[in-house]
């Protein structure tokens, strides 16, 4: 067993001043039976806690650290930017530079606006869609998490699912009634809802690759149905690529599946590990945003120079490496192949999902296509697996509903060590029914 004595003490102290001792619920290691390691530093593919334990990290700050932690070029760029000031609250040429870079990678984003979090991005995109269409209702998919905005915390995934509360207290009935929900990957249910309510729906928002009920890719024809029906009813189609952006492929899920949404939300990677996100899309929709239009959205720290600098440098580093996304996809495939072999040897039913460099596993005998399937996986086996991996210095997300991430910094040796650890962890999972 690893020693988490200092982390446990730090956790108890944190609980005095923060709800649950954390600033985001899943970090509290709910239901895992151990305190969360309190992190001190991270470099490359490794992360170290205050007890001195060093782990191979597959959380990657929940997605942003695609190059690995503390990448020298990114750190240097941030340091240079900080010497000029940490914030201006005024326009900079860097904001235009990152917008041009993002448009180059995502041509469907003709105009965009920087914000500080994925939640801000999705909230703002929905407001823009409502302003553009003059409609009130939105449609989302069960188990897809789009941040903690009121209208989006209805049958949500991620931490809400981890705590068994896909709906949140504090969301008014009036807000909830304008949010329609259908199962992810259920084409007939979606088509039926659009037939009944399509002309009232301002936007359909979806994670094109669901990453908050673990990793669940779209079934064949699902995204095509979304595009077809939204065009038919004049509804704005929003791809929430905060998580899967730059990971399913460098050009995102919309390139992988050849579906072009009206709007896109991005985050995580575009801040290079600092707080940054963006929403954007078709010119005529984005022209509704103030000061050009009547849809208001603003932010003191939007376009913060440190976050924008980190994002620009991260994207440039990725673009400079030939076949960057293919390299990460192969690393991920190699890891999952080893995990599946370990599960087979231990006699543990395991479903492995991957989309580029985001991935996840389900302790399940049947494939997982939606939130109901994800909830049916064996949570007790996941806990046994997770704790065994943690004790072998493999840092994974402490919830079966969270996706894992590969980085460019992960070496062949890292992957080999992780597969070796999986052999023992699957044996532990096999002891649990």
Task: Show where each model-derived region lies.
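Conserved N-terminal phosphate-binding loop of PLP-dependent enzymes in the Aspartate aminotransferase
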Residues: 1-433
């Amino acid at each position: 067993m690893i020693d988490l004595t200092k982390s446990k003490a730090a956790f108890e102290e944190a609980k005095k001043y923060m709800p649950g001792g954390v600033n985001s619920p899943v970090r509290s290691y709910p239901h895992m039976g151990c305190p969360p390691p309190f992190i001190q530093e991270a470099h490359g593919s490794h992360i170290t806690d205050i007890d001195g334990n060093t782990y191979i990290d597959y959380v990657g700050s929940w997605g942003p650290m695609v190059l690995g932690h503390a990448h020298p070029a990114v750190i240097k760029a941030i340091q240079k930017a900080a010497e000029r000031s940490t914030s201006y609250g005024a326009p900079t040429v860097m904001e235009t530079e990152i917008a041009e870079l993002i448009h180059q990678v995502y041509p469907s984003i003709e105009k965009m606006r920087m914000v500080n979090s994925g939640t801000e991005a999705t909230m703002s995109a929905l407001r823009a869609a409502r302003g553009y269409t003059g409609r009130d209702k939105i449609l989302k998919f069960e188990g897809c998490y789009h941040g903690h905005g009121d209208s989006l915390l209805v049958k949500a995934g991620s931490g809400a699912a981890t705590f068994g509360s896909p709906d949140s207290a504090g969301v008014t009935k009036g807000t909830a009634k304008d949010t329609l929900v259908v199962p992810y990957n259920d084409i007939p249910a979606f088509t039926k809802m659009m037939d009944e309510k399509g002309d009232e729906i301002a936007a359909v928002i979806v994670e094109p690759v669901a990453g908050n009920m673990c990793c669940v890719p779209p079934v064949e024809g699902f995204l095509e149905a979304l595009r077809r029906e939204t065009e038919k009813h004049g509804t704005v189609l929003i791809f929430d690529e905060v998580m899967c952006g730059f990971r399913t492929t460098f050009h995102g899920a919309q390139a992988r599946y050849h579906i072009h949404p009206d709007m896109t939300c991005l985050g995580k990677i575009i801040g290079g590990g600092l707080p940054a996100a963006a929403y954007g899309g078709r010119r005529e929709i984005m022209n509704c945003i103030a000061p050009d239009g009547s849809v208001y959205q603003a932010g003191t720290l939007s376009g913060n120079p440190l976050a924008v600098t980190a994002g620009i440098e991260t994207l440039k580093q990725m673009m400079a490496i030939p076949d960057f996304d293919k390299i990460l996809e192969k690393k991920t495939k190699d890891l999952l192949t080893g995990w599946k072999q370990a599960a087979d040897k231990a006699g543990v039913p395991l479903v492995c999902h991957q989309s580029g460099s985001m991935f996840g596993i389900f302790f399940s005998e049947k494939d997982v296509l939606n939130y109901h399937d994800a909830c049916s996986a064996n949570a007790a086996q996941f806990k046994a697996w997770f704790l065994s991996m943690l004790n072998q210095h493999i840092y994974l997300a402490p919830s079966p509903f969270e996706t894992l991430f590969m980085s460019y910094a992960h070496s062949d040796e890292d992957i080999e060590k992780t597969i070796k650890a999986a052999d023992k962890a699957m044996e532990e999972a096999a002891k649990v029914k």
